[in-house]
Amino acid sequence: MSELLFSLNFLLLLLLSCVSPSSFFTFNNPVVGLGACGPHQIQAFTQFKNEFDTRACNHSDPWNGVWCDDSTGAVTMLQLRACLSGTLKPNSSLFQFHHLRSLLLPHNNFTSSSISSKFGMLNNLEVLSLSSSGFLAQVPFSFSNLSMLSALVLSNNDLTGSLSFARNLRKLRVLDVSYNHFSGILNPNSSLFELHHIIYLNLRYNNFTSSSLPYEFGNLNKLEVLDVSSNSFFGQVPPTISNLTQLTELYLPLNHFTGSLPLVQNLTKLSILHLFGNHFSGTIPSSLFTMPFLSYLSLKGNNLNGSIEVPNSSSSSRLESLHLGENHFEGKILEPISKLINLKELDLSFLNTSYPIDLSLFSSLKSLLLLDLSGDWISKASLTLDSYIPSTLEVLRLEHCDISDFPNVFKTLHNLEYIALSNNRISGKFPEWLWSLPRLSSVFITDNLLTGFEGSSEVLVNSSVQILSLDTNSLEGALPHLPLSINYFSAIDNRFGGDIPLSICNRSSLDVLDLSYNNFTGPIPPCLSNLLYLKLRKNNLEGSIPDKYYEDTPLRSLDVGYNRLTGKLPRSLINCSALQFLSVDHNGIKDTFPFSLKALPKLQVLLLSSNKFYGPLSPPNEGPLGFPELRILEIAGNKLTGSLSSDFFVNWKASSHTMNEDLGLYMVYGKVIFGNYHLTYYETIDLRYKGLSMEQRNVLTSSATIDFSGNRLEGEIPESIGLLKALIALNLSNNAFTGHIPLSFANLKKMESLDLSSNQLSGTIPNGLRTLSFLAYVNVSHNQLIGEIPQGTQITGQPKSSFEGNAGLCGFPLQESCFGTNTPPAQHPKEQEEEEEDEQVLNWKAVAIGYGIGVLLGLAIAQLISLYKPKWLASLVIKSRNC
């Protein structure tokens, strides 16, 4: 939340002012630092910056951000924000600054560096910030040497482990480890509870857990801000929380807390109480509405019930934001809320009231700016022009309200900036007056039955609308001329047709355009090359993709799949250094594989399937393909040829490690548009997965998929594919691959779908496949495989068709027995266990004796063992996937 970030920044500034006595140079005169710094310090700083790519730094004043002690010449403060790119190594010159008291290196790109134990040598540090800089792995225990630290900020990295490094940091007043992967049980002996001077503690978005919030939090009685959002805390909030009498902000959302609401009545300084997304039950204490400084209260998404009582003295309440949606209140709750006359934000969404809500009940809330009644039953009469609701409203959300007519009451809301009417039954046309609302900037009216636009197109063109989302309606005909101020326009799944109008080229503020799933024809206008996101999927567009991408083009995502495009892939795409997503699948593009795109540093998804790509898939130098950030590569249904070198997958760095799925789960475009409301926009791909073709919205950033099926690839499957630990789906079917199935498949622990059918693979199916506990689909049919099918839950659950067409394969689920007879009928588990035990003893004796009576029989059995691996030799320990 913005309030939390403001609190942290304020505290850091306060601490920095304490770190900077008069012997230091002031912040507003950094140039003086150059004259005060000793020659060795100047040399060390120059060496430090030379270790990185510093193109983002302020080169007009290279010493900006450096402070030196005017008596000793030692660097005592270093601040380089969003400036450095490269690996921070243990032998870095940074660790020569032994007199540093403040080190601020936030928002740099240290490219997945581990935090060096050498930081523990900087034992004069009082303020250390390494937030949002790409650090991973555990924080070294040497941090416990930094006993002078007052502030430690490690937020927004990929750090793991526990908080044991905080031991001995007894002077710590600010600790922020939010948005990482720290984990473990917070028990009473945790080093966290030894920080008796802590005033700001942020554990948000980690994996901490406890059967209840530890009582020991109540001992940190100097705390002013406590945030444990989005962890795995269970149970009740302890009564000791009432000991934190200095607390001004308390954030507990998105955990598993139960019981009654925490006792906070004694926390008279509390201004923010955020309890969203838990399992709190019972009623709301009326005292919450009269707390002297409480301005923000979110109880949304719990199991609260009963009625709401607001004392008559509540007119003096400072409560400005109240979020009560998604609970189970009973009886009349709106009248009491109308007493809170200072409210600016009110969320009562999805309350499932048994009576219609009359909007005029909110007429007393003269300061109301935001009202969310989504999912509620709204009185039809209150949506007419005669109804009265506060004219101050800027945001109005009425989604999922079963509204059938466009609300005329909007005409009176001249301050309205944000409208959300999605998932209703509104039919007819957009009224002309809507676009005349003077401050209207964001309109979300998706999933309705609207067919067109009333009146003159000039009204829409001259409106103030910047964000317009009209997905899944019945809009038809030509695309209307968009507002001159438009920034985001989405009309997915409508019936628009004809050419994309060239007037769109005059919309200089347009960043996102999504016209997917319509009936547009003709060419793609070249001017659209300047967008951030361009989505034209599943239309009838023709011609070639414009080759108009100039240097530093901001394009992040281009999807023109499922059209009738021809020609070649634009060579100028190499200029799109920010490109993350490229889809041209299911067209008629005829070209060689675009090896040049591996130079794009951020490309994560490349979809080329069902075109006319031809020629070798291996690079001209026969080395690794080398897409550093690529996670999804689909090239199925082309005419690509050749073999894959043994190191083909070596440089696929992003696919070689898995990520925590709680953070950055999907490829998404996000933008704050009003307060806590965000515009989110997800990528979509068509994926052949587990033998089925499916459309997948919300593309994961934490997993990888590869589809090379339906080409003319040959040779062996490279063992280097076992490096791709994030791989969940692999399809190499319908090629001419030969050789053995790689043993390295056993390393693909996240694999869920594997299709190797219709190749010329030989040898046996690796036993390691049965250890892949997530593997739900396997198809190795129509190859030249031999031997027994490995027995395991993931393998034996496959249909017989997944193994057919291999003359030498035997064992379940095929009927062919590995001992030359038909597979015996199913037995009861006990009988089968006894028989297998007897068989195991018999066969081992036959092999071990070797000589004596029955020598020939023993040799025959030994030969069978060497060829087929009997079922009873497979020792199975498979853990089922925990759903």
From Swiss-Prot:
- Signal peptide positions (record): 1-21
User: What keywords is this UniProt entry annotated with?
Assistant: Cell membrane, Glycoprotein, Leucine-rich repeat, Membrane, Receptor, Repeat, Signal, Transmembrane, Transmembrane helix
Residues bearing attached sugar chains per UniProt: 58, 91, 109, 145, 189, 207, 243, 266, 305, 312, 352, 462, 506, 519, 575, 731, 779
Tell me where the transmembrane regions lie. Answer: 847-867
Membrane topology (UniProt): Single-pass type I membrane protein
Family per record: Belongs to the RLP family.
Encoding gene per record: RLP40
Q: Do you know which InterPro entries this protein is assigned to?
A: Leu-rich_rpt, Leu-rich_rpt_typical-subtyp, LRR_dom_sf, LRR_R13L4/SHOC2-like, LRRC69/RLP
Q: Kindly name one Pfam family recorded for this protein.
A: LRR_14
* Coiled coil regions, renumbered to chain: none
Extracellular face of the membrane: 22-846
GO CC entries? plasma membrane
The name this protein carries in UniProt is Receptor-like protein 40
The keyword Zinc belongs to this UniProt entry's keyword annotation: no
Report the locations given in the UniProt record: Cell membrane
For the Cytoplasmic compartment, the record's topological domain ranges are: 868-883
Name its species: Arabidopsis thaliana
Q: Where are the LRR repeats?
A: 97-121, 122-143, 146-169, 170-195, 197-219, 220-244, 246-267, 268-291, 293-316, 317-340, 342-364, 365-390, 391-412, 413-437, 439-462, 463-486, 487-506, 507-528, 529-552, 554-576, 578-600, 601-624, 627-651, 701-724, 725-747, 748-772, 774-797
